[in-house]
């Protein structure tokens, strides 16, 4: 009997899991996705300014380079389109069960028993959890928030029907999402307020465009794209190592 594998979630990790299982010769795979399409984080989040803070050609599968990314740091809709295309090109789609959220997973005598919100039941030898953590919005507990009469929503549930231009807008928090929203809205609104508990240290993003000629070169000479990816990965790894310093070091004192 072939190995039966259930994958929960069809975001970047879930898509990759199905692809690698197929490469290993496993074909009895079901990938459960609660939404109506793949994409995970990039499907769920549609707020103004959404983008990746990792270089486009690093934030992609090594076996599926994308010569058509338009910027060094991709906007969210380009990553979503990329993931949808990879799912088609690499045979993931036939294994998808969209709109079917897993609500129960019980392990008994060597078998996983899964049940979905639609009442479907299935048994698996192996279950891979790829549901992620960025699709459960957490609203802050603020006294009096229920009395606020204006539009209010979490960034992960952006209400596209609410007009923003020329309005008074407040954003709570200064994490990555808030920084992106601030940059996208500051010049569009009448008044913008950013409420933060702890100030961030922020530097400009050098988000240059890839020209038509560059993208054409990436398509016709794939090794050029691999070279760029390798360079970016190496540079980011080195920069990350440089950024992590001992709390008692002289260098940290210099930075501060």
Predicted regions and their residues:
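Feature captures the FAD/FMN-dependent oxidoreductase FAD-binding
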Residues: 71-135
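Short, flexible, glycine/charge-rich loop motifs used to bind or transfer phosphoryl groups or to couple energy/partner
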Residues: 49, 93, 104-105, 117-119, ...
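Tryptophan-centric aromatic hotspots in well-structured domains and transmembrane helices
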Residues: 12, 42-44, 69, 101-115, ...
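Rossmann-like dinucleotide-binding core of oxidoreductases
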Residues: 2, 6-8, 12, 16-23, ...
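A broad, structure-centric signal for solvent-exposed, well-ordered loop/edge residues
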Residues: 49, 54, 59, 68, ...
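Beta1-alpha1 glycine-rich phosphate/pyrophosphate-binding loop at the start
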Residues: 3-96, 196-197
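General N-terminal targeting signals
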Residues: 55, 59, 64, 69, ...
